[in-house]
UniProtKB/Swiss-Prot annotation:
The lineage of its organism: Bacteria, Pseudomonadati, Pseudomonadota, Gammaproteobacteria, Enterobacterales. Its main location: cytoplasm. The gene is yeeN. This is Probable transcriptional regulatory protein YeeN. GO terms for cellular component: cytosol. Belongs to the TACO1 family. YeeN subfamily. Keywords: Cytoplasm, DNA-binding, Transcription, Transcription regulation. InterPro entries: Integrase-like_N, TACO1_YebC-like_2nd/3rd_dom, TACO1_YebC_N, Transcrip_reg_TACO1-like, Transcrip_reg_TACO1-like_dom3, Transcrip_reg_TACO1_YeeN, YebC-like.
Length: 238
């Protein structure tokens, strides 16, 4: 899964320049998680997980606190999760996951982006069946066999454990992501660079420079939309 990890790193790195967008999107996700349960991360597993991911993305504490305080204060916005699937040039596929307080606005915006940026929006399930929902855990390390033993003893359902550029990269069944994190913490591992649920393509395509330019424009436009939280694709050279 080395190439898949490389693509995840590339996507995360590409987003790092747009810090204000990252902060805003995490703010929405934290608020939504806090509203759906207790605004205390120790009593709300979903909120705790989002906050951990926000810290990995270097979201400042004041942004996190502001979103939680808004939920505590009885903010009346309700956010709904969504998923939109579609196609780019020459076998390229894309999934956009959204979190929105206005579903009609989001549908219209996503459809417009696909139409204007050389893509075609598809029906639900038209693309996602070619992706595997996967837990991904990454931290500094160099002994994947030892880590695999830790996870095996904790009965974590692991798909793969690899070493990539000084990092241990673990792929789990999506339902065992939190269990895997807990097992690693119990073994003394406390700092993670990634703990995410990712949609990983089962196979990838490489696009020509011309098609890649079109596809990159489509991905960028989706990522720039305020309601889009994550974008997944199957293009190896992006």
């Amino acid at each position: 899964m080395g190439r898949k990890w490389a693509n995840i790193v590339a996507k995360k790195t590409a987003k790092d320049g747009a810090t204000s967008k990252i902060y805003a999107k995490f703010g929405v996700e934290i608020y939504a998680a806090a509203k759906q349960g207790e605004p205390d991360p120790e009593l709300n597993t979903s909120l705790k997980f989002v906050i951990e991911r926000a810290k990995q993305a270097q979201v400042p504490k004041h942004v996190i606190d502001k979103a939680i305080d808004k939920a505590k204060g009885g903010g009346d916005e309700t956010f709904v999760q969504g998923r939109y699937e579609g196609f780019g040039p020459n076998g390229s596929m894309i999934i956009a996951e959204t979190l929105t307080s206005n579903v009609n606005r989001t549908i219209a915006n996503v459809r417009t982006i696909f139409n204007k940026k050389g893509g075609n929006i598809g029906a639900a399930g038209s693309v996602s069946y070619m992706f595997d929902n996967t837990g991904v855990i990454v931290f500094k390390g160099s002994d994947p066999d030892h880590i695999f033993e830790i996870l095996l003893e904790a009965e974590v359902d692991v798909r793969d454990v690899t070493e990539e550029e000084g990092n241990i990269v673990i792929y789990t069944e999506p339902t065992d992501l939190h269990k895997g994190i807990a097992a690693l913490k119990a073994a003394g591992i406390s700092e993670f660079s990634t703990t995410e649920l990712e949609m990983i393509a089962q196979s990838e395509v490489e696009l020509s420079p011309e098609d890649l330019e079109i596809f990159e424009g489509l991905v960028d436009a989706l990522e720039d939309d305020d309601d889009v939280q994550k974008v997944y694709h199957n293009v190896a050279n992006l």
